[in-house]
Amino acid sequence: MDFSSEDAFRAGAAALMDNCLSLGLNTVLVQVRPFGDALYRSSLFPWSHLCTGVQGQDPGFDPLDVLLTEAHSRGLSLEAWVNPYRLKSSASLPGTIAPDNLICTHPDWICTAGEGVYLNPAIPEAADYV
């Protein structure tokens, strides 16, 4: 999807929803919390790097709102897919961590596995945050 502007994103979202309809689908599943960040305006999580290439940078519009509008205008339902624990999957995703990412704000809540960084659900405060 093209996040360069709201109009470009809306055009991509419309094409996606039209394709879903042509396939006979009635529900679209959208990942909205990929790396401890969000593809929607949030007071708890920084903007996803998938929006602008930089985690924490506001794209100037709410991608989830656009997706919801385009889905609902076609009679499609939309379900949000949330990764509640994954904060980073490798040395390159996301490349730069926003200062308000949980890796920075609560380093005592994280654990690592391979190249991944995760919120540790065994820590009560981290589990409550989710």
Task: Report each predicted region and the residues it spans.
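Hydrophobic transmembrane alpha-helix bundles
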Residues: 15, 19, 65-71, 115-126
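Active-site-adjacent "subsite" loops/lids of carbohydrate-active enzymes
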Residues: 1-10, 79-80, 85-130
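Conserved, mostly hydrophobic/aromatic
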Residues: 20, 28, 71, 78, ...
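Catalytic domains of carbohydrate-active enzymes, especially glycoside hydrolases
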Residues: 11-38
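Aromatic/hydrophobic pocket-lining residues that form the small-molecule binding cavity
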Residues: 9, 13, 60, 64, ...
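Aromatic-lined substrate-binding rim segments of carbohydrate-active enzymes
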Residues: 16-17, 34-83
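Glycine-rich loops and low-complexity Gly/Arg-rich segments
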Residues: 23-24, 52-56, 103-106
